[in-house]
């Protein structure tokens, strides 16, 4: 595969991670991505710029910060660009350390986690900020609600060693679909869904079209930045200042809107480029298993089904609308975070210290 095609593929997967902490400008840029195939094996891919000759050794661990480097689990010529770690363990999350020519190394994991009953569970590790610092793997996760939790998924969550769960759903949502996971403290920080309940009622009556759904979603995202919701968002970010709250999971109904906006604010604090922030946001469209939701809408009219699709999708335009409104009203994202979300320079440094590689 030509380099341009290879680069586009890795970028498309949104798993783009470049070697951070290079000691000099002569060090190569290393791009990696880790994916799971249909049966759970790990597909590890890499590219070096410029191309390197030699060998890449790959070590495996259940945790991202400790590897036994006595014997690699995989070894390949660097120019091969891909290797597969075969496993029948679909419970324990695996991380991999790639060592190129015994000189350059990088840790990577599969960003999206395969779950039976939980939607959209992802690790934010590996994203690079503008200073080429990487977000630490296994520290901050995002997902949909934990209200229908299988035994296998409860075991998978146990392996994450969560210290804190932030639930952004409203009180009525929490009462209707309580969190079933009991091995980590849950902090309820309700964020309003605006007029979405009205949209759901119109869907049930088959009185909604896709244009209506788009307007509801635009209103929803503008509601996220109102004073009504600012307190919960500020409290969520305040909890990220405390290192004892990590590893942390942020969740809402599907993990795409309220969670998506909060995670976007976090990534700005970590100084991640906006292009990466938007790519992470729309990745929900790949991580949500829409086939599990299909039985709920199969009897609706085609118009209603199109409206539901719009409501369930992570549309970049919705997040951009909120960001543009913030910039228009406050001048910048940083000013909004300071004045409304109470993120001063001290808070920013504390959050960065908790989540960025040093």
Identify the residue ranges that each predicted region occupies.
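Cys-dependent protein tyrosine phosphatase-like superfamily
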Residues: 22-249, 262-358
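Bacterial N-terminal signal peptides
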Residues: 11-20
């Amino acid at each position: 595969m030509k380099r341009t095609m290879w680069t586009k593929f890795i970028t498309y997967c949104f798993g783009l991670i470049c070697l951070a902490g290079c000691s000099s400008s002569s060090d190569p840029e290393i791009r990696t991505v880790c994916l799971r195939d249909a049966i759970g094996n790990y597909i590890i891919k890499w590219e070096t710029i410029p191309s390197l000759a030699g060998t890449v050794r790959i070590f495996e661990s259940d945790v991202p910060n400790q590897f036994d480097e006595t014997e690699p689990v995989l070894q390949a010529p660097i120019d091969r660009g891909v290797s597969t770690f075969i496993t029948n363990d679909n419970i324990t999350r695996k991380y991999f350390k790639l060592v190129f020519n015994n000189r350059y190394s990088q840790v990577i994991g599969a960003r999206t986690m395969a779950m039976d009953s939980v939607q959209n569970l992802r690790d934010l590790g590996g994203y690079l900020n503008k200073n080429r610092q990487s977000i630490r793997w296994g520290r901050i996760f995002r997902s949909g609600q934990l209200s229908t939790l299988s035994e296998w998924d409860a075991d998978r969550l146990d392996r994450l060693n969560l210290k804190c769960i932030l639930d952004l759903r409203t009180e009525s949502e929490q009462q209707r679909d309580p969190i079933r996971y009991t091995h980590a403290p849950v902090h309820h920080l309700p964020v309003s869904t605006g007029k979405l309940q009205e949209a759901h009622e119109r869907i049930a009556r088959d009185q909604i079209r896709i244009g209506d759904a788009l307007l509801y979603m635009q209103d929803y995202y503008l509601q996220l930045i109102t004073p009504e919701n600012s307190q919960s968002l500020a409290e969520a970010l305040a909890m990220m200042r405390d290192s004892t709250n990590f590893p942390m999971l942020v969740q809402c109904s599907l993990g795409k809107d309220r969670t998506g906006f909060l995670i976007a604010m976090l990534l700005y604090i970590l100084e991640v480029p906006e292009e990466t922030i938007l790519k992470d946001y729309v990745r929900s469209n790949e991580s949500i298993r829409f086939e599990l939701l299909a039985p709920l809408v199969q009897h609706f009219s085609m118009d209603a089904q199109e409206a539901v699709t719009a409501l369930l999708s992570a549309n970049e335009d919705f997040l951009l609308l909120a960001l543009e409104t913030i910039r228009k009203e406050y001048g910048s994202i940083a000013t909004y975070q300071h004045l409304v979300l109470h993120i001063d320079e001290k808070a920013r440094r504390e959050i960065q210290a908790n989540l960025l590689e040093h």
